[in-house]
Amino acid sequence: LMEALRRRDPQARFTFLGGDRMAAVAGTAPVVHYSRMAYMGFSEVLRHLGDISANLRTARRALEEARPDVFIPVDLPSFNLKVAKTASKLGIKVVWYISPKLWAWKKWRLRSIRRLVDKMLCILPFEPDWYAANGYDRAVYVGNPSVEEIDRALARVDVYLQQESDEATVEV
């Protein structure tokens, strides 16, 4: 996503929570590295509640200081809905990339989405219709980066196979 934004606007500046690849694109370090946010399971989250709270405070403070044109949360609804609330209070547009899977669980979060999220960018083609049927009409399908990467890889395999003999073997 950051690479695509950078191509559209080479002067774009990023304040972000993420990893090394994002840092390379942004040309700056993350406010919080994702390795300090990667907690799964009830007991692990419980053990790191202090870190999670500190990360949340850091994210909110970064929004207040940077005052970006747009806040783009990616998935992680438990954390990002709280940050989106801060962004919304600051008058910062919220454009969510990779919709939380509300259709599978925690549909009640839709109330917050309606209130806080200006645009939902979905990677599954049925999601905009699901959102519309549930009273949120600002969701759009933007394609799935994983599928697009697989398509590019398959295209490279096709080219390779066309160049090789009939006995070419491809291992996946």
Model-derived features with residue positions:
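Active-site and donor-binding regions of nucleotide-sugar-utilizing enzymes
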Residues: 1-164, 168-170
